[in-house]
């Protein structure tokens, strides 16, 4: 189960970093305690059934996320004209006398 959750968190983190947002996922588990033994057995059965349903839903969600996950989305940008990897996406900046990197512009 921990392996399943770590894969789920990895997929969520990769999709979140693609959009430059961070998503924090938390998983909680609860138990119900009753003093009545008859109700306790019924509640334990209900809880185990709910956990089984949730684990099936989690596995389905994980499969859906893995299908959407595409390795090509994380490849670095390659300029089709200059074949430069990870360079500027617009026209050549030195040709137009300015350079912009991470929101900072310098003119020369």
Swiss-Prot record:
Keyword line: Chaperone, Mitochondrion
Compositional bias annotation for Basic and acidic residues: 95-108
UniProt-annotated stretches for the region Disordered: 33-59, 79-108
Pfam families referenced in this protein's UniProt entry, alphabetically: DUF1674
UniProt entry tagged with the keyword Coiled coil: no
Compositional bias segments (type: Low complexity): 33-46
Keyword Mitochondrion: yes
GO aspect biological process, one term: mitochondrial respiratory chain complex II assembly
GO CC, any one term: mitochondrion
Main location: mitochondrion
Compartments reported by the entry: Mitochondrion matrix
InterPro entries: SDHF4
Record's function text: Plays an essential role in the assembly of succinate dehydrogenase (SDH), an enzyme complex (also referred to as respiratory complex II) that is a component of both the tricarboxylic acid (TCA) cycle and the mitochondrial electron transport chain, and which couples the oxidation of succinate to fumarate with the reduction of ubiquinone (coenzyme Q) to ubiquinol. Binds to the flavoprotein subunit SdhA in its FAD-bound form, blocking the generation of excess reactive oxygen species (ROS) and facilitating its assembly with the iron-sulfur protein subunit SdhB into the SDH catalytic dimer.
Similarity comment: Belongs to the SDHAF4 family.
Description of how the protein assembles with itself and partners: Interacts with SdhA in its FAD-bound form.
Protein name: Succinate dehydrogenase assembly factor 4, mitochondrial
Organism name: Dictyostelium discoideum
Organism lineage string: Eukaryota, Amoebozoa, Evosea, Eumycetozoa, Dictyostelia
